[in-house]
């Protein structure tokens, strides 16, 4: 592959801006294309929980999850909810989702692939933050998982597989939990701390800083919505936008949940779906955790950010266009109050902020990282689901390696877009 190509990167989220930085490092010219502000409220990265969980190697679907589907359909406020009106459209994706976690062997295969992608992610993000002049936004201080009992932990397939792929952790009994987290509800009597993991103090500000760093390093930003990719034979000639064409030698599709239309325009109808996520944030709370915590029973991450105490999590399958169900954010708020009983229940509404966005998700829990079938000038980098922020650092490196014709630093076969084609 020739060096010094003009690369158009569609999407200025975490994956897109880091891909831009790494492509510039390889000597390419870069144009970022996005209608929104990098790191703005419209972006999935903005509302991210802020966990840099290099141990998040377990896909959402696990053996036996099919038994829970009726409950997901009946409970619009559960950890995973499926809107009836969207079910016909989501059904093909849901079937692939269930099959991907049908056996433990399949889940284990996914875990090994994700471990390759996520290993050392907090360190990679720290280096990027230092380059961008915002080292204070990335902390590598470990994260805690809280369980009601040791039995809940022992019966969790995910932790057996994490051990298998090389994740280490520190185990805490009830007394040690109280010492570390005195304000956490005493119903949590067992915990594990994954010391290799970290957190981002402000995901939106981090992505904005990375975008500014890319621009300062020579990238350009075009505020437009990309609608397609223009080929001449097997050669890419332009990215098509609502305001015109942008000539380029190569393109990266990193448009998150809106990547599906772009891949279809070049003959790759990929099964990308949006897992809608919510967060609630309390500004200047009176109490809270000392560290970042995931509550196993609530399926919710609680993390301190520069803007306040943020609780994020759960999944809603309802597509890109449906209005948000803000009761799901209220459930997160109630879980937060339950986890930390000393939080006042009369916090003014003006101090409680809610948000919702779209996780771009492939049914098997693995992103698409690789070339389009129609042209090796097109690189796909989307579909990270729950590991978009943490996985973006290595994904950007892989994108730059693919653009330059270099050997990728990890095996990319598990992430190949052709696995569903």
Swiss-Prot record:
Q: How is it used?
A: Has potential use as a glyphosate-resistance transgene in crop production; can metabolize the herbicide glyphosate to yield AMPA and glyoxylate and confers glyphosate resistance to A.thaliana.
Cellular component (GO) terms are:
cytoplasm; extracellular region; peptidoglycan-based cell wall
Q: Which reaction does it catalyse?
A: a D-alpha-amino acid + O2 + H2O = a 2-oxocarboxylate + H2O2 + NH4(+)
What Pfam family is a match for this entry?
Answer: DAO
Q: What are its cofactors?
A: FAD
Question: Which residues of this UniProt protein bind D-proline?
Answer: 359
What Gene3D superfamilies would the database entry show?
A: D-Amino Acid Oxidase, subunit A, domain 2, FAD/NAD(P)-binding domain
Keyword annotations of the record? Cell wall, Cytoplasm, FAD, Flavoprotein, Oxidoreductase, Secreted
List the GO biological process terms: D-amino acid catabolic process
Task: Tell me where it resides.
Answer: Cytoplasm; Secreted, Cell wall
Protein family according to the UniProt entry:
Belongs to the DAMOX/DASOX family.
This protein is called what?
Answer: D-amino-acid oxidase
Q: Which organism is it from?
A: Bradyrhizobium diazoefficiens (strain JCM 10833 / BCRC 13528 / IAM 13628 / NBRC 14792 / USDA 110)
Q: What is the lineage of its organism?
A: Bacteria, Pseudomonadati, Pseudomonadota, Alphaproteobacteria, Hyphomicrobiales
Gene label:
dao
